[in-house]
Structures are given as C-alpha cells and as structure tokens.
Amino acid sequence: MIGTGRFARDIAATVDIRTAVSRALTPHVALGRVIMLVNPLSGGVGPNAASEAAGIFADYALEAAIIALEGGQFDVQVQQALDAGPDALFVLAGDGTARAVASRAGPAGPLIAPLPGGTMNMLPRALYGTSDWKSALRQALEEGAEQSVAGGEVSDGRIRESFFCAAILGAPALWAPAREAVREGKFGLAWAYGRRALRRAFSGRLRFSLDGRADRRAEALVLISPMISKAIDEHAGLEAAVMNTADALQAFRLAAHAVFDGWRQDPAVTTRSIQQATVRARSRIPSVIDGEPVLLRHVIKVRFIRTAFRALVPNPPTRAEGV
C-alpha cells in the first residue's frame, strides 16, 4: 500500500497493491510493511520525491507509507514511525536527519535505510555506494539484508551527536567544506574555504586522552568508524587519527592532503584504535560530524558503540569509500 502526507493519514488511507507488482523483493529479509520519511526541503530531495518514491514502491508486493516531515513536527513524526514497528524505515532527508533517525532507532529498532538526500551524504554513500536515492532505494528493496553498523557518540554536556562515518574535532574540521567543494569541481569556492581554514588553523590546540591514558596535545583528533576505516578491524573500536603540525608549512601540507589525497600517510598524522576519548580546549571546538559542521563546547566525551543500529543494505554489502 502507498500513502503520502501526514502520518496518521498515511497509515489509515493506504491501498494494497500486491496484485499489481512486477519486481521481486529481496529474499534476505521480510519487507511486508515499510515507512519512508521524506524531507522535501532537503538539498538532495526535491518537491516531487514523495510521489517518485510512491511510484517505485508500487512495483513491489509490500505496504508502504510515505510521510513528509514538517517543521516543528520532526520529533513526533520520527517517534510515530518507529512506534509503528515497520520492517524497514527509509529516510530521504539531510545528513543530520538520517543520523538522528538511525541513532534513535538503535539496535532494537527497525532496519534503517538512510537514502542520499543531503549535501555530503557520508552515511548513505558508505552503505549504498551511490548518491542517487532512487538507485539506493531499489538496491535496498531488491538486494537488502541486515547489517549491524558500528559508530561513535560525541557529547559536550549540552548536545549528544552520533556518528557512523567520522567525527573531525579541531581546526582541520574547517577543511571539510573545502574538500567537498573540490569533489564537486567548485575550485573557487574550495579556495575561499581553504583561506578561511588557514586563517583559523592556529586558533587553538586540543588536549585529549585516549582510553584513559595520559593527556596529549594535537591540532586535531579524527575519530573514524570501522565501517569506513581502512586501518582497523570491524569490532576493534574507533580509529583515532591524531593530527599535529609544527609550523605553517606543515599545516599547509596537511591541509593539501586533507583536500586532495590520502591524509593518513602524512608524517604529521598518527593513528590507533580506541574505545573512548576525552577532548578539551580553551574555547569552543569546531567539528564535523558525519559531514555536518557543529560547534561544540570546550570539553568533549567520545565513546565507541559496537552496534549503533541495524541497516538495510545490499547483499553483499557495498564496499564503503574508506578513509
């Protein structure tokens, strides 16, 4: 059945389409009833996404409800979708929304399918290997299987943010917009972002402790989930990459690696696997959490989550774009 609009109306007014289908569903999990949350205002979604998704769902023998997220109703709509207990919950929205839904679902919730509807789409690209949400949706419907996704949690005492790809803490977080601009071929914009990042590169250093060890200092700390790390095993923990620069020339070299190529090979970077970390600074800490810029307070706690949520991903899983 297909429904669009407000949640209550979606659940009540759907129509069974099991006799009008033409494509086979995945044999790996049962998908009898699914829900899709859509934010039509997100940059990668568009005003026609709900009707386009309904057209795709109509090709399969399942019951589907499509809910358009509304300002001020986000928390209620997400909780209603989770409480409905669907076999899978699809999310076509921005990066932050996808993370929030996956985090709230947790390992006991329904299978989560975060489709690429944001700007950077780090989590969807890691799971589906594409930035085309329609292709990712069909992959999930036709080849989907359950996969436990590990991640981390960052808390500054005021906000608590989950991440499933990477968290960049410190001045090099300012390079994330430049890197994305380069990927999109917007070199003028990348240069502008790069100049801003260099101006702020020495505004403060971090003090941090990994797994309760003695404090150290660094320019930045990057925490990478096992889903995309090329350096650690799946259940070993988070990869902690410590970035240090001694002078402006080193900072520029590290910035170039961050924008253009493999930063891990830079001599200013050291890595290890961890379960938890504490990070401090004299001022608020610029950060990027799964592609979204966040300004955190001056004391941060980070912890590894072995099973953060259960994802609906292609079988065999798409190889994530590792870092």
Predicted regions and their residues:
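ATP/NTP phosphate-donor binding region
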Residues: 1-92, 99, 134-137, 318-323
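ATP/nucleoside-binding phosphotransfer catalytic cores, i.e., glycine-rich phosphate-binding loops
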Residues: 2-24, 235, 242-323
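Catalytic core of DAGKc-family lipid kinases
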Residues: 37, 60, 68, 106-113, ...
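Cofactor-binding loop segments of dinucleotide-utilizing enzymes, especially the Rossmann-like FAD-
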Residues: 39-41, 69, 117, 243-245, ...
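A general beta-strand register signal
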Residues: 58, 155, 209-212, 280, ...
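Conserved Motif II region of HX4D acyltransferases
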Residues: 96-97, 173, 291
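Short glycine/serine/threonine-rich phosphate/pyrophosphate-binding segments
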Residues: 97-101, 122
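Active-site beta-loop-alpha substructure in enzyme catalytic cores
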Residues: 216-250
